[in-house]
Swiss-Prot record:
It is found in: Cytoplasm. The gene is eIF3f2. It comes from the Eukaryota. Component of the eukaryotic translation initiation factor 3 (eIF-3) complex, which is involved in protein synthesis of a specialized repertoire of mRNAs and, together with other initiation factors, stimulates binding of mRNA and methionyl-tRNAi to the 40S ribosome. The eIF-3 complex specifically targets and initiates translation of a subset of mRNAs involved in cell proliferation. This is Eukaryotic translation initiation factor 3 subunit F-2. Belongs to the eIF-3 subunit F family. PROSITE patterns: MPN. Residues 11-145 form the MPN domain. GO terms for biological process: formation of cytoplasmic translation initiation complex. The keyword Magnesium does not apply. It holds the Pfam family JAB.
Length: 285
């Protein structure tokens, strides 16, 4: 497809790509204001379909309006992805934010080389969800300027549609249904492991409240101190390393996200095995 026909193309995007971008934004390093990554997909006779993506580490230099991408990392991840999905090609890049950033022209030059004959697409995702909606906009750069003079880039909007296959619709409806449900019963049916974590956390909270009340009563001379209890508390406190609350919160949330991801994947695998077993039984009959 010609570079000049990129804006006329029909562009579809898989819902999983948007979930990947949101997950990358939630896991971004502390201090980073945005997430940048590569868009992968297929181009079938002018019909683009964005099916995958991955995040590329970067370093921002706002004082000189420059962003340094880890090109070596991007090349390695792209090679690994090509081994797994040989039909996917680089279609452009994504960036989180409300609008096209000033560094978009610099990133466009890099991805123009990666895309070859196809004009790179630029996806902007507002992952803050302040308006309770996921805002997505797709752009394609067009060269502007006078012949023989200085030329620049103008990013024009490109129509973007979410590709909803049968499997995608089932997953999205399940997510929507669970998000609208409230109460412990629904949570217990969907992710019982998370309910166990909540119950264990409540039990720890009750035990901590009991210990704090005991210490307060001893300090207020309302209760006689017990040397055995004191030594046990000292041993328990010294056994746990002192950790900053923010670091502990970050570590806990990271482990919780990993656990939820593992639960989701295991549930999907279990469902797929059950469906395969039923299909096999139908074929035997």
């Amino acid at each position: 497809m010609s570079r000049n026909l990129g804006m006329r193309a029909k562009v579809l995007i898989k819902p999983l790509v948007l979930f990947q971008i949101i997950d990358s934004y939630e896991r971004r390093p502390k201090g980073d204001n945005q997430v940048i990554g590569t868009l992968l997909g297929r181009n079938k006779e002018g019909h683009f379909e964005i099916t995958n993506c991955f995040t590329v580490p970067h370093k921002e230099h706002p004082e000189i309006n420059r962003i340094d991408l880890d090109i070596a990392y991007a090349s390695e991840i792209l090679e690994l992805n090509m081994l797994t999905y040989p039909n996917e090609r680089v279609l452009g890049w994504f960036c989180t934010g409300k609008s096209v950033s000033r560094s978009a022209s610099l990133l466009h030059d890099y991805y123009a080389r990666e895309c070859g004959e196809v004009q790179p697409l630029h996806l902007v995702v507002d992952a803050t969800l302040k308006s309770q909606r996921l805002s997505t906009r797709l752009y394609c750069a067009v060269e502007i300027g006078v012949p023989g003079g200085t030329k620049g880039l103008m990013f024009s909007l490109v129509p973007l549609e979410i590709s909803n296959g049968n499997s995608d619709l089932v997953a999205l409806r399940s997510i929507e249904k669970q998000s609208l449900q409230q109460g412990t019963k629904q949570l217990d049916r969907f992710i019982p492991e998370l309910v166990q974590v909540v119950d264990a956390t409540r039990d720890i909270q009750q035990r901590l409240d009991l210990v704090l009340r005991y210490i307060k009563d001893v300090l207020d001379r309302k209760r006689k101190p017990d040397n055995v209890v004191g030594r046990a508390l000292h041993a328990a406190l010294t056994a746990v390393p002192v950790m900053d609350p923010d670091k502990f919160r970050l570590m806990f949330n990271t482990n919780l996200r990993d656990m939820l991801m593992a639960i989701t994947l295991s549930t999907m695998i279990k469902t797929q095995l059950e469906i395969s077993e039923k299909l096999s039984c139908m074929q035997d009959q």
